[in-house]
Regions:
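Non-catalytic signal-transmission and effector/linker regions of two-component phosphorelay proteins
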Residues: 1-32, 36
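Output/docking surface of receiver
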Residues: 15, 42-44, 74-75, 99-104, ...
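Conserved phosphotransfer microenvironments
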Residues: 21-27, 46, 58-90, 99-106
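Short hydrophobic/Thr-rich beta-strand motif most characteristic of the beta2 strand and flanking loop
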Residues: 31-45, 52
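Conserved PLP-enzyme active-site core in the AAT-like
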Residues: 43-46, 69, 219, 239-249, ...
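N-terminal "arm"/small-domain region of PLP-dependent enzymes with the aminotransferase-like
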Residues: 126-210
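Conserved N-terminal alpha-helix of the aminotransferase class I/II PLP-enzyme fold
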Residues: 190-238
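Conserved C-terminal alpha-helix-loop-beta "cap" of PLP-dependent enzymes
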Residues: 456-551
Length: 551
């Protein structure tokens, strides 16, 4: 693959089209790059350059004219402002300032720390400057690909014959039939050539976590804050069962969120565990809310165990594991720290099913509301977080991750891996593994925060627009019987005239989204202060005709 054709250079210079020495020099540099089939995006103002960067985040190098003229229409955006915004979103893309040697002394240290160098377009030759830009872009792109995906691409692009499974032999078998030819054309040759088997030693083994697969899993653990991460190609359904098969034995007592996924119920059956259910709240809309914190207190759990008809001798049955859904389908996420505090003395293992919240670690709005939070106390329970990467991040369907945060509950990798192998095919789909590897790369560093921030921005705009439309309809001359519109299940401060918060506050202040005990919007009683929060990204629409009382 020729990366250079896919990753353009962004040239921000207000003299690009001017009949000046600087303008002619800039055009010659651009021409040199284009003559070498290197695409260039041209921007004549700071604002246009910023928009070009935001709409083309895959640019491989950025050239900024230090003498860009700030314009009122651009909000007086300067070259220094551009370097700060770009560097905040991408800490590695090369940035060069187009300037003169004598002007360097006037460039602030803050700007110097954000750039990779200077270009003196009136002194060096155009060919040399273009080559310098191209080299910087190539160096940047050499680090773009994560380990497994890089290895997979290298193998596919090495034009090797397939002497192993799968039987379609790199897609060739599909070419022997009309339906197969259409299938081949639809999915493309690279997809089919990348459908490989464990017979390719260069790519390591998912079952043994070796080679570039193991390297990719270790990188994922680092990015997602885990002590160890396993790539699961059977979705979070398989990941949930792996956790249970590795930690629970027949007759063990387990605490189970009654609002759990079917795979957790399957795990109970498969392991022969004895479930004690934690009942979540439910409001009059029928929305399932959080398990009240009172349900997770040791004395309440002890009473539940005493009343369980399957437990003959409660004193001889310690609780092995607790499984909590975080977040719920409607976006209720817990203070995981409080849950761990309540369960600390009762269980060795806590399993957070985070199928719908794999992005929470990457934005401060969700601080303390995900399983892979930092913990320095080895006496804390061991925590598992199973995440559907394919649901909420950029991965292929069935691509999930199983994260482990080691505590006092033993996790022997060899034993754990036996449970892993029971539920993972010996012929895993390599494109799923590659997508998990790429999802990790996308969330690493500053990128993860900004990807989540974009989702938050869009969700908040949507929430506010839904309310604004309702207000416009109410203000119209329609008769009451012709009036209807959807409402959004959300805190009043989103749009209430007296308490409305600004978009930036809503993106940064978790307090705006808490299920406070003195508020009626959520419809749950007995909720502890700061215990549960509504994820802004999960929008629940209430249809006309259903009242808050369920009528």
């Amino acid at each position: 693959m020729d990366y250079l054709e896919e990753f353009p250079v962004l040239f921000i210079d207000d003299e690009l089209h001017s009949d000046t020495a600087e303008g002619r020099a800039s055009r010659e540099i651009v021409k040199e790059l284009k003559d070498e089939d290197f695409p260039v995006i041209e921007a004549l103002t700071a604002r246009d350059g910023l928009h070009a960067f935001l709409s083309h985040p895959h640019v491989s190098c950025i050239i900024i004219d230090w003498d860009l003229t700030p314009e009122p229409a651009d909000g007086m955006l300067t070259a220094a402002d551009l370097t700060a915004i770009i560097r905040e979103r991408n800490p590695k893309v090369p940035i060069f300032l187009n300037t003169e040697k004598l002007a360097i002394s006037a460039i602030p240290l803050g700007v110097i720390s954000r750039i990779d160098g200077y270009i003196w377009k009136l002194e060096d030759t155009h060919a040399f400057i273009a080559g310098h830009i191209k080299r910087a872009a190539k160096n940047y792109l050499s680090d773009v690909l994560p380990p497994f995906f890089r290895g997979l691409m290298d193998y596919v692009e090495d034009y090797r014959y397939s002497w192993h499974t799968p039987g379609h032999m790199g897609g060739v078998a599909f070419l022997k039939n009309a339906a197969g030819r259409i299938f081949y054309n639809f999915f493309g040759e690279n997809t089919l050539r990348a459908d490989l088997s464990v017979s390719v030693p260069e790519l390591g083994s998912l079952l043994e976590h070796s080679g570039v697969v193991g390297e990719a899993e270790r990188k994922a653990a680092e990015v997602f804050g885990a002590d160890r991460t396993y790539f699961v190609t059977g979705g979070t359904s398989a990941a949930n069962r792996i956790v249970w098969l590795a930690t629970v034995t027949p007759g063990d007592l387990v605490l189970v969120d009654r609002n759990c996924h079917a795979s957790v119920m399957h795990a109970i059956i498969m392991t022969g565990a004895i479930p004690v259910y934690l009942m979540p709240a439910r409001n009059d809309y029928g929305i399932i809310g959080p398990i009240r914190s009172g349900e997770i207190r040791p004395e309440i759990i002890a009473e539940k165990i005493r009343r369980c008809p399957l437990v003959e001798d409660p004193a001889s049955h310690p609780v092995r594991l607790a499984a909590i859904t975080n977040s719920t389908y409607d976006g209720i996420c817990y203070s995981t720290e409080r849950i761990e505090e309540n369960l600390r003395e009762m269980v060795e293992y806590i399993h957070f099913d985070e199928a719908w919240s794999g992005y929470a670690r990457f934005h401060p709005l969700y601080a303390g509301r995900f399983g892979m939070r930092r913990s320095t106390d080895p006496a804390d329970p061991t925590v598992f977080a199973t995440q559907s990467t394919h649901k909420v991040l950029a991965a292929f369907s069935q691509g999930s991750m199983l994260h482990v945060r080691q505590g006092r509950g033993a996790v022997d990798h060899a034993r754990f891996n036996e449970a892993f192998m029971m539920l993972i095919s010996t012929s895993p789909q390599y494109t799923i593994i590659a997508s998990l590897d790429v999802a990790t790369k996308m969330m690493a560093g500053h990128s993860g925060k900004f990807l989540v921030e974009e989702a938050l921005e869009e969700a908040i705009v949507f929430r506010k627009k839904m309310v604004a439309v309702a207000e416009e309809i109410r203000a119209s001359p329609l008769s009451p019987e012709n009036y209807w519109w959807f409402t959004v299940w959300q805190p009043d401060c989103i749009m209430d005239q007296e308490t409305e918060k600004g978009d930036q506050v809503l993106q940064e202040d978790a307090g705006c989204w808490l299920l406070n005990p003195d508020e009626v919007w959520h419809g749950f009683d007995g909720i502890e202060e700061g215990y549960a929060m509504l994820d802004p990204v999960k929008v629940t629409i209430l249809t006309p005709g259903i009242g808050a009382d369920g009528g």
